[in-house]
Amino acid sequence: MALTISETLRIGTRGGATLTGLGDVTGALEVGRRADIVLVDLSGVHCRPVHDPRAALLYSVRSTSDVHSVLVDGDLVVADRRLLTYDLAQILSDADAIAAELVDLSRGGTIQHYAP
């Protein structure tokens, strides 16, 4: 039996919150709960026509390019598709430096094995 759009959204919101033990603080837009909100841009041609915004969210939205803004516990962390809370360039630079150290410590060996 297929899930309805409403059931699928409920699983992704209230259900996800419940499974992570946060069902009493998040998972729904209600007074007293954390305001964890993702604002999605449905204006792209891949989202058109929008007969049902819920269906567009589930079937058409691209995971990163359509996310416009994000609030976590009411705090704006992404605005106009830009991360506000961390310096992404610095994070990537730090990660590259750590990876280089790991390669150096491996004495020329592999630091990660990928099965064929």
Predicted regions and their residues:
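Active-site microenvironment of metallo-dependent hydrolases
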Residues: 10-116
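Interfacial and helix-entry/exit segments of alpha-helical transmembrane bundles
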Residues: 1-12
